Amino acid sequence: MIFLTTLPLFWIMISASRGGHWGAWMPSSISAFEGTCVSIPCRFDFPDELRPAVVHGVWYFNSPYPKNYPPVVFKSRTQVVHESFQGRSRLLGDLGLRNCTLLLSTLSPELGGKYYFRGDLGGYNQYTFSEHSVLDIINTPNIVVPPEVVAGTEVEVSCMVPDNCPELRPELSWLGHEGLGEPTVLGRLREDEGTWVQVSLLHFVPTREANGHRLGCQAAFPNTTLQFEGYASLDVKYPPVIVEMNSSVEAIEGSHVSLLCGADSNPPPLLTWMRDGMVLREAVAESLYLDLEEVTPAEDGIYACLAENAYGQDNRTVELSVMYAPWKPTVNGTVVAVEGETVSILCSTQSNPDPILTIFKEKQILATVIYESQLQLELPAVTPEDDGEYWCVAENQYGQRATAFNLSVEFAPIILLESHCAAARDTVQCLCVVKSNPEPSVAFELPSRNVTVNETEREFVYSERSGLLLTSILTLRGQAQAPPRVICTSRNLYGTQSLELPFQGAHRLMWAKIGPVGAVVAFAILIAIVCYITQTRRKKNVTESPSFSAGDNPHVLYSPEFRISGAPDKYESEKRLGSERRLLGLRGEPPELDLSYSHSDLGKRPTKDSYTLTEELAEYAEIRVK
């Protein structure tokens, strides 16, 4: 824009009307296009008392002092001028009317400079005015853009050209305004401190796309080839818009992740990476990376990019999904239940993607769910069979984890059918196997003796627990006659169960009773057969008379063993025998039956030949009854 600082013309005229002193007025600066002309308006004044007959004047170039011999632009007295101004300068004003307006034609760059006027009234009445005008020779129109152009807000851009040549008048037009929507153009002529300016106003609403747009103005002079163009680039301010950002990102745990955020704005934005309200990185830039080294599941989540400047802000988010194997499952729920209750067990874990969850027991799948982080196991009316160890397994394509847990079902005692009594000679052992939770108490009752023995009496009862099974063994000795009835009773806080224990191997007792008589008969028959064979064959004259003497043969005691797996080897203790006999001898029981016999094995030796004596093939057994 051209700024002129000289006083307005009307102020000079007022001052001149008062008269009485030397003075001049002209614009301090004036401009014109190269090749055109310019009219420099000028008025001067002098004291009224001088009253000259003729007034002359001189225009100098770049110096007001004649002593310096400055180039003469115009001289009214002699018409002698500097060669640079030959045919280019003439006076438009009437010096007698104190008008010193100068016209310069066919302007060229070397004519740009300071122009001074000197009044010549004759004699010593000559005066060079200090006021001067600076001529600027231009080649382009002046485009004025507001200091701040904001997108979306209407703006006015002006094109100004000097209009100080009375012979050539400029015509203005806009260039490159087609991409500015629907602009409007206004034109006017404006006086600016004695000079004239042709002005064209362009109104439009800029967009962010108009930033950097090259807008031009053209000044053309009709009937000539003179055209002058000027251009200006639009600096459109607009708020940020995020134009580049990652879409959802999937990364495996431990890998490197780089998130990019790019924004378009003017001026450049402040970019900020944030997560959960915490600033992770920020910088004034058009794009900003956020690098995450060895990502963990804790870094999984939503990341936000915020772009802002003085004209607004924008933000966008990106989801980072960290893929990882399931964590060790956690189990919440009932671990102890009473038989018949409903048990609810919740198994949960965390993984990405969600895992396949499975609950199984002893390789049998009880419940499973696909792509869920929780699995609920419902066991209605639990039974003792539900007691035991369970596993919750979580797996996805990145790994597998498992957790074991135990369910303890509490129930009343159950005496198993394998419970029984067994007798061997004078020893009776009773086995009572109880399934129970919690551990029960076990007692053996002998109704015929009116005696009850429990596991605290370790001389008679041995107990051992394995899991839910409790095995109790009652050992009775000195039972030569029929063994007594034995009832096993087990109880805990949930109930009581009793069972009369059946006897196994009862035929052994029968053989123990008839054994002495049968043995005598068997030996008698054996002797008869031997004698018959001896007399028949007459091969050998052998006289044998078998003799059975109690003193010749030691007692051989037959005591078959009855053992239960895990039972202690304490049955031969003398103290035990004494205690057991005292227990069984209560209430006037009959005395013990001591049966001693030796066993005869008729088939021990192989047959030699048909002449071998039967006595040589058989062993004998002595049976003694007391």
UniProtKB/Swiss-Prot annotation:
It is found in: Cell membrane; Membrane raft. This is Myelin-associated glycoprotein. One of its GO terms (biological process) is cell-cell adhesion via plasma-membrane adhesion molecules. GO terms for molecular function: carbohydrate binding; ganglioside GT1b binding; protein homodimerization activity; protein kinase binding; sialic acid binding; signaling receptor binding. Changing R118A: No effect on inhibition of neurite outgrowth from sensory neurons. The keyword Methyltransferase does not apply. Residues 1-19 form the signal peptide. The chain crosses the membrane at residues 517-536.
